[in-house]
Amino acid sequence: MKRLKITVIVLSALIFLSGCRAKPDGTSSSAEPPTAVAAAGSRNYLTMLYSAADTFNPYTAATNINRQLCRLLYEPLLKTDNSYNISYSLAQSAEVKGKECTVTLKSRYFSDGSALTADDVVYSFNLAKKSNTEYAYKLYEALSATARDSKTVVIKLDRADPYFANTLDFPIIKKGSDTKTDSDGVTHPPIGCGRFKLNDSEDKLITNEHDPGKDRAIKEIRLINAPDSEAVGHYVEIGAADMYYSDISDGNILRMSGKKVNINLNHLIYIGANLSDEQLSLNALRQAISSGLDRKEICRDGYFNNALPANGFFNPAWEAVKSVQNINLQANKEITVENLEEIGYNKLDSAGVRTNGAGKKLKFELLVNKENRLRVTAARIIAKRLSEYGISVNVAEKSFADYTAALSSGNFQLYLAEVAITPNMDISSLITEGGSAAYGIKKPEKKADEKTEQTGSTESTASEAEQTEEQNLTAAELVSGFYAGTNTLADLSSVLQTEMPVIPLCYRTGVLFYNDKIENVNNSSCSDIYFSIDSYSVGE
């Protein structure tokens, strides 16, 4: 059988059509961030936007601006930084063994002076699980949480997951404080262990005197009421707020003068293929499409540099996969053409479209949700680039309803989409037949005589027998084996890149704009955009 060329170096070692597992090793940190003290010529406050009509309950807040402020009012057990490493907050440790995660708590206090206990964590866990928030989405593997003692919580899982602890960034509130009312029957926001607390009139955040970082330079957060998206846009554009964050999920980017930092999101942009299609079921064709695309171009011109080019299936910012992912980021015409000719598409018709000996043409339709302008732009870039190799792609811009209907019915060839990967880096729903985001995926047929040729490899780190065994496993089987502890991330990455069930393009980033007088804005992440607020300083 002819040898298949692909663009990767194989090392042996829910669909979001529009967020961010724990490293159980020494890369995790429980150290408190450094604290800045206000100096002469600086101010001790920040001004931010909020919605007075919305709540500061982290499990019911509806607006993005209030949800982000909740990260200052309520601390989680742990956070992940912008490279998906764990930084412990209220937890001293989070140890995952098999189907159980044991969390040990630090000695910390709520803003009312009462001590944090395991019962508060269990209460918050149950709220998170039943909420309509990202926290419920992340905790899909968690079955229950119980208090072993006042400082220990045990979380039962439905399967083993070495990176489960990365999902434990749900806000911790004082047990029952979300249901208490005042003498007028008004329910106020719950009590947290955050860096700040609400003042009595609930229109300003002030220092929580029971927080270890209380001596930070920033003593209060002054709030401006922005009741709707139009008001938010206005205040951002005129610079009324010192900081503003957007995940750009709708494709619209607000501009604010000053500085900005990109926030890594675990949102994969990819091309999905209907593997029931005779042509697209050919691995060589999917490899050709992958190698023919310039991922840097898509990030630059499609997403205005608010994305990281994907060198594999997992987020390239994740330290654990930096040495095991190596899809080419720029287009490789030679490899693309070789792959196409290997499967018989070695002629061009009068329109420049590749055909095989039977007259079959490489003509496809690429579905895209027309309601997201960034994705539409990316789809057009993809079509233009592939046309250079004789692959004709018609971009079909559909309404969200029509787009999802086509995917659900299987009435498509190619589609451009975005999926939010949970912080435990679980991509099984995307690549496993029957998965919630696995449109067009089916278990590939194994051929005993099929071989692949890896290009660019200079050395082998596994025996030929081991490589053959890995290649005989499908990506879905390797995912299952990874959680069972029989396969490594290197194994999984290798087979994903060889099998190419979908074509990864890039991982989107959000953006945090901030006043150019603010210093030390470091390691802001989707887990906490104010990650380093204890070290902020603001010039006058």
Label each PLM-derived region with a short phrase.
Residues 17-19:
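C-terminal motif of bacterial Sec signal peptides marking the signal peptidase cleavage site
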Residues 90-132, 279:
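Aromatic- and charge-enriched surface segment that lines or borders ligand/interaction sites
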Residues 48-96, 126:
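N-terminal lobe/hinge region of extracytoplasmic solute-binding protein
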Residues 282-383:
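Append "and occasionally in soluble cytosolic enzymes with long acidic Gly/Pro-rich linkers
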